[in-house]
Amino acid sequence: MPTHPSYTPAHGAQPLVSFIVPTYNLPVDMLRESLDSIMDLSLTQEEREIIVIDDGSINSPLAALADVIDQIIYIRQPNKGAAVARNTGLGIAKGRYIQFVDGDDRLVRSGYEHCLDTIRFQEADMVVFRSSAKEQESMGTASDRGPMSGSDYLRHNNLRSCVWGYLFRRSLLGNLRFHEGITREDEEFTPQLMLRAEQLVDTDAVSYYYRKREGPVMEADDNRAKARRLDDLLTVLDTLTERLDRLPADDRAALQRRVDQLTMDYLVNIITYTRSARHLERGLLRLRRRGLYPLPTKHYTNKYRLFATMMNNKAGRKVLLYSIPLVVR
C-alpha cells in the first residue's frame, strides 16, 4: 500500500504539542470534527503538530482534507492496528508534549485549554484530565491536584489507562512504545509511562469527548475475541509483574496496585464472559502459577477489598459468579 506523507512547512521552533490521530475507516466528517477540535485551540500552527495516521482505510480521507493539508502530517500505512499506528506517530512527533486523539473523538476546548495552561505555566510532565461520553463543555472552574509524582498518583488512585486521557512530555518516553499485536496495550503502556513523571497534575476539567464504540471494534459477542482479550490481559500482567522487581520500593508499590486491580479485572471479565465456574477455576490456576492468586486483600478501595476477600474462598466465588453478571448487565 502506498504512503502519502504531507508535511507542514518547517517553522524552526519546536511545536508545543504533537497530536497523534489514528484513523481507520471512519466517516470523513467525523475525522474532520476531530481535527477541527484541535485546530480550534489557542495554539498557533507553529505551536501544534497534527499527525494523522491512516491505518489502511479502504478509502483514503486525504482528498476530503485538502483544505487543511498544509496544517497536518498525513501518513497512510497498511492496516496493523492501533498500537502500530500510535507507534508510527511517536516516531514522527517533534513536539515537547504528546496528546493522542482517536479519529472519532474530539477535544473539549474549554477543558483542554486549562490543560495547555498547566503545561505552559507549571511545566508539568503529565496532565491527567477527565473525559465524557456526553457532548458538553467543561463547566465552572477546574480544580487541580498536584503536582505530584506519577508514582504517588498510582499509589493512591484508580488509574484510567486510556492513552487519550492525559497529555504528557515526550521526553518521558525514552524507548517505551506500545506493545503491538495485543488488544490491551493501553493497560501496559500507561502505568509504565506514568511512573516516569516527576510532576503530574490531575485536573477535573472535562477535556475530551469520546464516542461509545459498537460493532467490530468491541466484538462483544465473539467468543474468540473474548478469549483473546483475556489472553492479552494476561500478557499485560506478565509484562508488568516482570517489571516489579526492577523498581525502587515506592514505584514497586505503585505498580503492584495496578497489577492487583488488573488481576481483579481479569477475573471479573471471566465471570462476565463465561458465567462458568470451570472457566473461573482455570483462570485462577493461571494466576496462581504467576504468583497473582490468592489476591492480596489490600484496602485500595472498598470494592477491591471486598472482591479479593470473596474471590479467595469457595463460597465467595459462588456468590460472585451469580451476582457479577447481574450487576454488569
Describe the predicted segments one by one.
Residues 62, 77-93, 100:
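Glycine-rich, basic loop-to-helix element that forms the pyrophosphate-binding segment
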Residues 35-78:
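Acidic donor-binding segment of Leloir-type glycosyltransferases
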Residues 207-214, 220-250, 269, 273-292:
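Catalytic core of nucleotide-sugar-dependent glycosyltransferases
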Residues 14, 93-96, 109, 124:
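Active-site acidic short loop of glycosyltransferases
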Residues 2-5, 26-41:
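Short, well-formed alpha-helical segments that are part of the catalytic scaffolds
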Residues 82-83, 102-202, 210-227:
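Donor-binding/catalytic cores of nucleotide-activated saccharide
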Residues 15-18, 37, 49, 188:
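Cell-envelope/extracellular polymer assembly enzymes that use nucleotide-activated donors
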